[in-house]
Amino acid sequence: MYNTSKLFNSTTYLTNDGIQNTDSHMMKNIEWGAVAYLKQSIYGLGITDITINNNSSYYTGGGTGTSYKTNIGQSTSGNITGVYDMSGGAWEYVMGNYNKQAGDSGLTVSGVPAEHIDIYSGTSVAASHLGDATGETAGWYSDSAIFVNSSNPWFPRGGYFFSNDAGVFSFGDYAGEVSDHFWFRSVLSVKE
């Protein structure tokens, strides 16, 4: 998942003019938190809970074609320009990890640059990082709040399409296994 996200920085995906000024990586836990807080702000839905994407085929925006236009409640902003699938659909792994343990991911965690991963030294929300939308928001909107540990060292975010505790502030603990129920989100950013 991490290595796949890094591929977006290759010339296959970007123009020759822009490739030196971009960074692609798998979304970090704190980056998920930033989007979650934006949803909670006046620029997003505010205190209105985001609608769960309950599409069992995991389609972005809750369906095919133009369904994203009618399912704007699934967007962080309440309109089509927001970020979709932050609640429900499939769990989305982020680069949030307990104690540099690989679990079932197959990733050499120690080889991941520090700017691309959030490492947690504890197994409760007391070990959260300020801004990652775990400790400070645990349980908001009745979203899942299960912290990483030695058996399940990876954070997935958002929750399942069929789960009542799915939501933008939902987080869980999993081993890093590949599954059709677990996806990931890539980030492409501009370097200064």
Please give the residue ranges for each predicted region.
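C-terminal, surface-exposed recognition/capping segments
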Residues: I30-G33, T60-T64, Y68-G103, T108-E192
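Short aromatic-cysteine micro-motif
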Residues: M1-M86, V190
